[in-house]
Amino acid sequence: SDRLASARTLSFSGFVGEESPSRLGPPLLYTTKYAVTVQRPDKLRIVSPGDGPATELYYDGRSLVAFAPKENYVATTAAPATIEAALDLAFDKAQIYYPFVDLIVADPFKALSEGLRVAFYVGESNTVGGVRTHVIAYANDHAFVQAWIGADDRLPRRLRAIYRKDPLQLRHQMDITDWKLGEPVAAGAFAPPEAAKKALPIPFDRPQAAAPAKKP
């Protein structure tokens, strides 16, 4: 977490698998890929294709832009001056949430350890992320998490969580690859694409509230 906290820029790819109940009983798995670029303290880009609508989020320190390229919708709102505050705003206004938020805030260790009840060392693994990892497990009042942390670079390679209040004990897993810390980021990386400028504007709001009414 010290490496993450001290990096002015960072990028990674996140591959998320989330279980969802099925009518037959056993859960189904839905997957999403995220391409994440961060420039602290006030720039963020998240591009997300997956088993559902593709989404893109851009934050430049002044505004948040959410773009749905397939539906051709774009939502824009004024935003506060830090990544953490902008992500809080995105959740409060539009229920936009990402499973890797704790990794990109200013103090990842504080975010990950908040409310910690128990933690223990499981052992080593050589099968995750193509590197040797330390495997740890920890729990708070909300979730039980197993984490694979690079033994040499101290970067998270896999996180696996079960939420304590979930009666079905569904599993949520994220593999994290392509880590790049401290590398230059192109000046226009945090600006929406040209297609977003031509998209249909909608309110930056919860999905059902923001979607335009269909023509009869």
Predicted feature locations:
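Flexible, processing/modification-adjacent segments and terminal tails
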Residues: 2, 6, 63-132, 138, ...
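N-terminal mature ectodomain segment of secretory-pathway/periplasmic proteins
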Residues: 2-73, 140, 145
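Residue-identity detector for threonine
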Residues: 9, 31-32, 37, 55, ...
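Gly/Pro-enriched, hydrophobic low-complexity segments
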Residues: 15, 50, 56, 65-66, ...
